Amino acid sequence: MAPLVKNHGEPQHAKILAIGTANPPNVYYQKDYPDFLFRVTKNEHRTDLREKFDRICEKSRTRKRYLHLTEEILKANPSIYTYGAPSLDVRQDMLNSEVPKLGQQAALKAIKEWGQPISKITHLIFCTASCVDMPGADFQLVKLLGLNPSVTRTMIYEAGCYAGATVLRLAKDFAENNEGARVLVVCAEITTVFFHGLTDTHLDILVGQALFADGASAVIVGANPEPKIERPLFEIVACRQTIIPNSEHGVVANIREMGFTYYLSGEVPKFVGGNVVDFLTKTFEKVDGKNKDWNSLFFSVHPGGPAIVDQVEEQLGLKEGKLRATRHVLSEYGNMGAPSVHFILDDMRKKSIEEGKSTTGEGLEWGVVIGIGPGLTVETAVLRSESIPC
């Protein structure tokens, strides 16, 4: 793809100026998780379900995950692990305080890397599917961080796993259309609301129990970065959202007295794979319409599961290793929802520095973030990497 011509007399595209990530302290290794799950849910006698779950975990390509839930929390709140028991109040009371706190940890890391006074934050975007409250998690984070009470807030609830790309689109719009804006974006998920006891009638729970994980990400976005003061990581060039036709049954979640019930169709990888070339082609038409060499790009693909990642790789004809960062996050963190694609970008830019690459995008100039979630909704963001000083 030919480089875009930049007119330095005009506002530049928004840029990611810093990235921070955080996880709860409790790490669960996948090889040990089946023992934990069947013990705490009092299902050790269910050898049939245990065999199914063991196979799902083996195929998950996840080595470890981080969760807020502990055995102590579950023992104190048996309604959480009793399938169908009314437990929404217990879950929400926990999450409405813990989700903003996890977001705060990621935000403080991003702000530290950015290196500017917190008073320069003009906009806040908070995204979560874990809790619902008024005033919301955005309001709580303003207090936790000590942000200006006049900061412009945007709260996104229940968007799901594609929203890690959505927030980049919104931050881009805010940064490019408000002179001097510095946008703090925070995505935080604690999947306690999705935790359930086991049952023969709802086997989707086994898949979620093998993949879902907790984490928070924060990015700071602004246009026209201050020379020698702000150090951009990626430029946000173009964004696009689309719904895959006839796929609304693919990922469904409903808030109920028992928490979030969810349904995960085995057709999701097929839907994504069958449409990935089309939606990437249309995304890049917004840039210059010329790029069809997918191997010339770096990728941050939502790690919704190994079959989804495999389908993206296969249908785009990607070379081995092109999705290294995506597979690394799936292995070491699991599916954290919206924060996942930011974890991937963070890993990518750090690995690029470690390996002496010329850019933050694995030595490549152009790349793309692909968020995938309920709808099925696909949100893409075209990024341009930044040079790494020698």
Curated annotation (Swiss-Prot):
Its EC number is 2.3.1.177. Optimum pH is 6.5-7.0. Induction: Up-regulated by elicitor and by endogenous H(2)O(2). Homodimer. It comes from Sorbus aucuparia (European mountain ash). The active site is at C161. One of its GO terms (biological process) is phytoalexin biosynthetic process. CDD domains: CHS_like. Pfam families: Chal_sti_synt_C, Chal_sti_synt_N. The keyword Acyltransferase applies. One of its GO terms (molecular function) is identical protein binding. Gene3D superfamilies: 3.40.47.10. This is 3,5-dihydroxybiphenyl synthase. InterPro entries: Chalcone/stilbene_synt_C (IPR012328), Chalcone/stilbene_synt_N (IPR001099), Polyketide_synthase_type-III (IPR011141), Thiolase-like (IPR016039).
